[in-house]
Amino acid sequence: MTLQRSGVGWKHVAGLGVSLVIAGQFTGWNYGLASGWANMAIATLLVALLSFGLALCVAELAAARPHAGGLYTYCQDAFGRFTGYMVGMTVFGALAIGTGAAATFISAYCEHVLGFGGFPLKLALIAVIIGVHLRGVGEAMNLLVAAGVISVLAIILVLATLAPHFSPANLLTPELPLEISPLGVFSAIPFAIWLFITVEQTTAASEEVDDPGKNIPRGMIAAVMILLVSALCILLFAVGAGGITHLAAADDPLYAALTSPLLSKSYATVATIVGLGGMFGLLATMFSLAYSASRQLYALAREGHLPKVISRVNRLGAPDLTLMLVGGIAVFASLAPPMSILLAVVLSLSASYIVVLAAFIRLRTVEPDMPRPFRAWGGRGTAAACLVLSVLVFAACFQLDIAMLAGVGAYFIFAIAARLFSRRTEAAPAAAVKETPANV
């Protein structure tokens, strides 16, 4: 059972990478402003370096071994099946619940801009997105890229509108002076990473990409550069025009910047357009998260970590059972507080980064002659630096609430139990065959 190659090129890969992340540029990042603008800016540059280096490393691995399992495949190659499985389940859980959180944010934007939302809208969004993915990767990718382009245009509109109103004085308040402190940077990191997180999950498309040795690296590098430029401009112009106090606690910081009392005139129409753009951005991220999560679980089942039936594909080459499982998890996640979900995603994915970067270093060491159509710039040095940054991100997440940490721990226990159950059910028929009289 294999996935179809469907004419997916580097532009689709770049679109997938941007779409996976773009919602984080509309919401979530601004909570880091509570640590002060300078500390948030430094935290953003640190996680940008992490994201770029990580993208180079996983692009090398994906080009060498295109696989729908993405990160877990490389961890399995380096450290064995159990480690690979746990990384795969960690990534799957983060992406699946992130799909539900994206539905929650879309509902919130829709209620604010259009006047309706709630659970029925979340349910409809999840059903439509899973339905489109069931039609095959080609149609899903085209819609995903279109939604991503619309959301990027919305951000450009925000920046063009706010840039003339920029004032350095708006970047600070008496309570939040323009001072730099290690603790302030550390506190801002879990929020700064929302400007880039999950871009590395584009490797899930490598099995369906034409010429992955060329298109995966080119697409991933393009995605990170687009996101970096966008993130820095948002941090400078949105905060510098709307004011740090006004944006720090807003659920919709770009919309809040356009309606800030600090602006010399009203931009109500532009704010409405940007609100709609934010919905498209979240929709693009929701598409991307559902895509990557379904491929992750499909690959785990196909490799025998989970029951084989989960790796079934429909007549259009889409993994239908994994998509429906992602949809079910997303429905339940959409009922949870979104910030708790988002912070659980950061903790889980940063843990997977640590393992995959260690896997990159190990594979460079023990398999130096493995064919590598693309080689990461800086090699093991880049991976080691990113490994240190990943540990920093992971440690920063432990300033968060106990309930979220307990939930992540419970999920890991479930993942181990699921693998043990799968191994027992697959071993039982084999044992039964050995005990039949005909085989004695």
Short names for language-model regions:
Residues M1-M40, S51-L56, A68, L176, ...:
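Membrane-interface "cap" regions at the ends of multi-pass membrane proteins
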Residues L3, M40-A41, F116-G117, A146-G275:
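Helix-loop-helix junctions that connect adjacent transmembrane segments
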Residues G7-G17, G80-G93, L121-L125, E179-A192, ...:
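Select transmembrane alpha-helical segments in multipass membrane proteins
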Residues G9, I310-A318, Y353-I402, V440:
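C-terminal membrane-solvent junction of multi-pass transporters and transport-like membrane proteins
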Residues N30-A41, T104-F119, G138-G148, I273-F280, ...:
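Transmembrane helix-loop boundary segments of multi-pass membrane transporters
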Residues Y31-A34, G53-I126, I130-L134, M279-A299, ...:
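Hydrophobic transmembrane alpha-helices that form the core helical bundles
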Residues T73-Q76, G80, E111-V113, G219-L289, ...:
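TM-loop-TM module centered on a large, flexible mid-protein loop between adjacent transmembrane helices
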Residues S107, G118-P168, E179-I180, M220-M225, ...:
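Membrane-interface loop-to-helix entry segments
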